[in-house]
């Protein structure tokens, strides 16, 4: 069995409607199919940023190198791609490209051995506690509270809210503004988080996510304001996920800190070495697929750190290891995944449960591919 081709399928204008939205949002995904000469197909998805550049890297650089190689030798291929194409930091476009390829390789491996990827990787747990990233910035404060009640009424007990882009007047900060130009008064965000806490009570886990928007002094103010709300974690508060600044922040707040979602393996190692996080958020579509994701999970376990984050691919990593602690269900992404894929893991009563189908256990929805494929 040898690698023969890679096909990229771009989907666009997929309608998804989060709770309380009157009009659907339009989303898109970039799918990857890795094919072998004997008919096996591995499914994956391109994550991260600079998608056109990532697609070009896959088609023009990585595919010619991979053709004719054994798809079951994921460690050999990862090592060879690392040394041939990038021995410096392993980040950005290169990482998104090899991550998508590695996930597809593991899908093929699971199908070849007729075993789910999560079992091949370790099989520590079949179900993982889930949290819902529901708190979109488009919601008003009242809508945010109502949406929180919706998810709790539907059996979910862990909720995450986006923060850091709304100023004291309740106005959105200018798109693309740097962290230095955003409001440094947390009053509106605290009001929104308080509205959610009041709506769902103290028994529901509540998290905040700033998506790397803040300077250290700003993050300290936000943390001090959030501390009475008993947050499970504050995710990626510091600009650039700066390990040293995150470590300083941890010393100034009792709120646990999470980070790492779009980072490479080497950047995750920096976070661990700097004692910068309480939770390491590993994403297989950026860390280097399952091959490097398992190494990152092992590194986290060695330092007694749980791992979080997630999508339908990451769930296999979380289920494989004993420190797989929280699986993210991002509302927009999950609704998109339900439109694009069949046989997704089951979300019910605050848990994600994986199936026993070989490989990733998911299939493409051919109707969605037909309806939303980019010309």
Question: In which residue ranges do the predicted regions lie?
Answer:
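Structured beta-strand/loop patches that form or line metal/cofactor-binding pockets in enzymes
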Residues: 1-43, 47, 338-341
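Conserved, mostly hydrophobic/aromatic
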Residues: 3, 39, 62, 101, ...
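Short Gly/Pro-enriched turn/cap motifs at secondary-structure boundaries
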Residues: 20-25, 153, 335, 358
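Metal- or metallocofactor-binding catalytic centers and their adjacent structured scaffolds
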Residues: 35-112
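Glycine-rich, aromatic-flanked loop segments that form ligand/cofactor-binding clefts
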Residues: 98, 102-137
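Metal-dependent enolase-superfamily TIM-barrel catalytic cores that perform enediolate-based chemistry
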Residues: 127-247, 252
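Shared catalytic-loop signature of beta/alpha-barrel
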Residues: 224, 230, 239-351
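C-terminal extensions of enzymes
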Residues: 340-375
């Amino acid at each position: 069995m040898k690698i023969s081709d890679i096909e990229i399928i771009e989907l666009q204008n997929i309608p998804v409607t989060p709770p309380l939205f009157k009009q659907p949002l339009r989303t898109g995904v970039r799918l990857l199919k890795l094919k072998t000469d004997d008919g096996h197909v591995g499914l994956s998805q391109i994550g991260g940023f600079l998608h056109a550049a990532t697609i070009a890297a896959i088609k023009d650089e990585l595919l010619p190198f991979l053709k004719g190689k054994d798809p079951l030798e994921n460690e050999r291929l990862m090592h060879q791609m690392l040394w041939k194409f990038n021995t410096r930091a392993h980040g950005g476009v290169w990482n998104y490209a090899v991550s998508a390829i590695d996930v597809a390789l593991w899908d093929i491996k699971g199908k070849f051995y007729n075993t789910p990827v999560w079992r091949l990787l370790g099989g520590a747990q079949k179900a993982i506690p889930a949290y819902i990233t529901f708190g979109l910035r488009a919601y008003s404060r009242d809508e945010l509270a109502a949406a929180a009640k919706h998810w709790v009424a539907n059996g979910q007990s862990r909720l995450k809210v986006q923060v850091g882009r709304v100023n004291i007047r309740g106005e959105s900060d200018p798109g693309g503004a740097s962290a230095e130009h955003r409001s440094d008064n947390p009053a509106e965000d605290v009001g929104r988080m308080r509205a959610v806490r009041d709506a769902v009570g103290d028994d529901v886990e509540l998290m905040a996510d700033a998506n790397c928007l803040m300077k250290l002094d700003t993050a300290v103010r936000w943390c001090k304001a959030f501390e009475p709300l008993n947050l499970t974690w504050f995710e990626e508060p510091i600009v650039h996920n700066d390990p040293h600044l995150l470590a300083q922040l941890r010393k100034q707040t009792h709120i646990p800190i999470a980070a790492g979602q779009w980072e490479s393996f080497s950047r995750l190692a920096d976070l661990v070495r700097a004692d910068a996080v309480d939770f390491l958020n590993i994403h297989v579509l950026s860390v280097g697929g399952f091959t490097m994701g398992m190494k990152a999970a092992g590194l986290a376990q060695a330092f007694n750190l749980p791992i979080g984050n997630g999508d339908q691919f990451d769930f296999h990593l979380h289920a494989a290891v004993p420190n797989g602690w929280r699986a993210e269900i991002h509302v927009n992404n999950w609704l998109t995944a339900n439109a694009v894929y069949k046989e997704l893991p089951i979300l019910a009563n605050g848990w994600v449960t994986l199936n026993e189908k070989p490989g990733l256990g998911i299939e493409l929805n051919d109707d969605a591919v037909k309806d939303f494929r980019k010309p």
